[in-house]
Regions:
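Soluble non-transmembrane domains of integral membrane proteins
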Residues: 1-168
Length: 168
């Protein structure tokens, strides 16, 4: 979607006080790809800093014929926010959880670079920093995931570059 221009819809209020932001990419007459961001009311503590993201394929059955899975390529570069690079780097990694497990797995905290291929289902994948995380949570799990990070050089104002290729 990097090379395409989406059309923004007006910001709308939801019944629970959240706001929705919708971006559409026309594909054919009456068919479009829709990105829907739901920004929750921060007066509810359990939803502070929570942004929901849904992808909708509207009237796209002819364009998506025979598709049973979608490949997601997710990447993010994190900036150094704290004074001490080494300390912040130790708390920055990729985390994930297997279905039915209570423990959380991760790629390691202070490695220069690391990657892992997971061929079984995972509930979610998160790019984790010391105080904040970005998580991809699929409604019916992620079936495969290739996860990796590279650590930036101290003094570059960056911390890590994350990537995750997942099948949903």
């Amino acid at each position: 979607t990097l090379d395409y221009v989406f059309t923004a819809q007006p910001v709308a209020g939801e019944a629970d006080g959240a706001k929705s932001v919708v971006m559409r990419l026309p594909v054919a007459e009456g068919a479009y790809l829709e990105y829907r961001y739901l920004i929750y009311n921060t007066e509810a503590p359990e939803r502070d800093y929570l942004v929901d993201f849904d992808v909708r394929l509207v009237n796209m059955a002819p364009e998506m014929a025979n598709q049973t899975q979608i490949q997601i390529d997710w990447a993010n570069t994190t900036f150094q926010n704290e004074k001490g690079f080494q300390n912040e780097n130790m708390y920055t990694t990729i985390s994930y959880r297997f279905p039915g497990e209570s423990s959380i797995e991760d790629l390691g905290m202070s490695e220069k670079s690391k990657s892992k291929s997971i061929s079984t289902s995972v509930n979610w994948v998160a790019f984790k920093q010391q105080f904040f995380s970005s998580a991809f949570i699929a409604p019916q799990n992620v079936t495969n995931a290739n996860l990796a990070f590279d650590t930036a050089a101290p003094g570059s104002e960056l911390l890590k570059s994350f990537s995750a290729q997942m099948t949903v």
